[in-house]
Curated annotation (Swiss-Prot):
<protein>
    <recommendedName>
        <fullName>Small integral membrane protein 14</fullName>
    </recommendedName>
</protein>
<feature type="region of interest" description="Disordered">
    <location>
        <begin position="77"/>
        <end position="99"/>
    </location>
</feature>
<dbReference type="Pfam" id="PF11027">
    <property type="entry name" value="DUF2615"/>
</dbReference>
<keyword id="KW-0472">Membrane</keyword>
<dbReference type="GO" id="GO:0005783">
    <property type="term" value="C:endoplasmic reticulum"/>
</dbReference>
<feature type="topological domain" description="Cytoplasmic">
    <location>
        <begin position="71"/>
        <end position="99"/>
    </location>
</feature>
<feature type="topological domain" description="Lumenal">
    <location>
        <begin position="1"/>
        <end position="49"/>
    </location>
</feature>
<keyword id="KW-0812">Transmembrane</keyword>
<feature type="transmembrane region" description="Helical">
    <location>
        <begin position="50"/>
        <end position="70"/>
    </location>
</feature>
<dbReference type="InterPro" id="IPR020309">
    <property type="entry name" value="Uncharacterised_CD034/YQF4"/>
</dbReference>
<dbReference type="GO" id="GO:0005789">
    <property type="term" value="C:endoplasmic reticulum membrane"/>
</dbReference>
<keyword id="KW-0256">Endoplasmic reticulum</keyword>
<keyword id="KW-1133">Transmembrane helix</keyword>
Length: 99
């Protein structure tokens, strides 16, 4: 506890708030559970969504692969056999003239 009897945790999660959540949970469970049976399908969104996270990740991977294959030649890193690797054809550059 902090000075003056003020508890900052009480602002975030109070006992009353926790009890309200518990009561709401019990009330919701009563809507799909009876004395004789409990339904397996809980109310809410079903698991058969149109687009899943896996499908989104696969789509991003396909887009990345396409962009990788279609990158410009100067970003590919390999030179064509007829082109020199540097302006000096692999030799050291000439020394600067001495004044």
């Amino acid at each position: 506890m902090a000075e003056g009897g003020f508890d900052p945790c009480e602002c975030v999660c109070s006992h009353e708030h926790a009890m309200r959540r518990l009561i709401n949970l019990l009330r919701q469970s009563q809507s799909y559970c009876t004395d004789t049976e409990c339904l397996q399908e809980l109310p809410g969104p079903s698991g058969d969504n149109g687009i899943s996270v896996t499908m989104i990740l696969v789509a991003w991977m396909v887009i990345a692969l396409i962009l990788f294959l279609l990158r410009p030649p100067n970003l590919r890193g390999s030179n064509l056999p007829g082109k020199p690797t540097s302006p000096h054809n692999g030799q050291d550059p000439p020394a600067p003239p001495v004044d």
